[in-house]
Design a protein with these regions (language model features):
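Active-site loop segments of alpha/beta catalytic cores
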Residues: 1-69, 73-78, 101-103, 147-280
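Membrane helical hairpin/interfacial module
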Residues: 88-122
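A contiguous, low-structure linker/loop signature
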Residues: 109-147
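Short, acidic/polar
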Residues: 84-94, 217-221
Length: 280
């Protein structure tokens, strides 16, 4: 099978037909993903977008999960955690079908970032995981007891394996994607308690963000660069965006907690932040 046969807009049309529940489209899309998972498109994935153009890209892992669940019965837990080759190939194939030339591999990064610490999670069968909002990992009394996790097993190893496969298939430099301090705090402390402290105890919030940076994110970033010296790190901070906590709090809490890491150098500029709801 030739993936180029599904060059835009043919691939997008196939996805639309599949989403509409057309039986023939489901059969066809299964043939595409059978070939993808078998490695038949690996050569295609090595063709990267031109560097002298401006590209749009997309996070497609949720759509890839929906497809694999529909045609193979793969659950979210299996999809994200058990087979890095299947995961990467499925995501790259979805990008090609959508007509996205700039390949980009991500995962349920907010969920993974807090699961590393022991946060209770919710794993639906066909939707991405998330932290359980009814069972926050930390509170105001114990939040500074949080220690550095092991980055050589479980979720960090799963991410490392995904990055190794991505680099092998595409040649792209490995890009670690994890939560920024504020969004990590929101997922393990609770959105509402954290917002209350933003209003009434901002000093505590800043101390908490610095603790998470020092104990979790900085060691994780340093682990990443020890494994992938040519790597990059993308911090995401939707919860810390100006739309959620206001522009001034975004500056003095979210952005401040990032900029203080690595004495402000941010590993020679190889660590950056995005996902401020378009405000970056």
């Amino acid at each position: 099978m030739d993936l180029d046969a599904y060059f835009y807009p043919q691939g997008l049309t196939l996805l639309q037909r599949w989403q509409a529940g057309e039986a023939a489209a489901k059969t066809e899309i299964k043939d595409v993903f059978d070939a993808a998972i078998a490695g038949e498109f690996d050569q295609n994935f090595s063709i990267l977008a031109p560097a002298d153009e401006v590209h749009a890209t997309a996070s497609v892992h949720m759509l890839a999960l929906a497809i694999l669940h529909d045609i193979y019965g793969v659950t979210a837990d299996e999809y994200y955690k058990t087979d890095p080759y299947r995961y990467v190939r499925a995501n790259l194939t979805v990008s090609r079908l959508l007509g996205v030339n700039k390949l980009y591999i991500t995962w349920a990064l907010y969920a993974f970032s807090c699961e590393v610490l022991g946060q209770k999670m919710m794993y639906p069968d066909k939707f991405p995981p998330g932290s359980d909002p009814d069972h926050a990992l930390i509170n105001k009394d114990n939040c500074f007891e949080l220690e550095t996790p092991d980055f050589n097993s479980r979720i960090p190893k799963i991410i490392d394996d995904i990055l190794r496969v991505t680099e092998e298939l595409t040649g792209m430099e490995p890009l670690l994607q994890i939560s920024a301090p504020y969004s990590l705090a929101a997922d393990i402390y609770g959105q509402e308690p954290l917002l209350a402290d933003v209003l009434h105890d901002p000093d505590h919030v800043n101390k908490l963000l610095d603790h998470l940076a020092d104990k979790v994110l900085v060691p994780w970033i340093e682990h990443h660069f020890s494994v992938f010296p040519n790597g990059w790190v993308e911090l995401s901070d939707a919860s810390g965006s100006p739309f959620f906590i206001g522009p001034e709090n975004c500056k003095t809490m979210s952005i401040r907690s990032i900029q203080r890491m690595d004495n402000g150098d941010l590993w020679g500029g190889r660590v950056f932040d995005c996902n401020y709801r378009g405000d970056y």
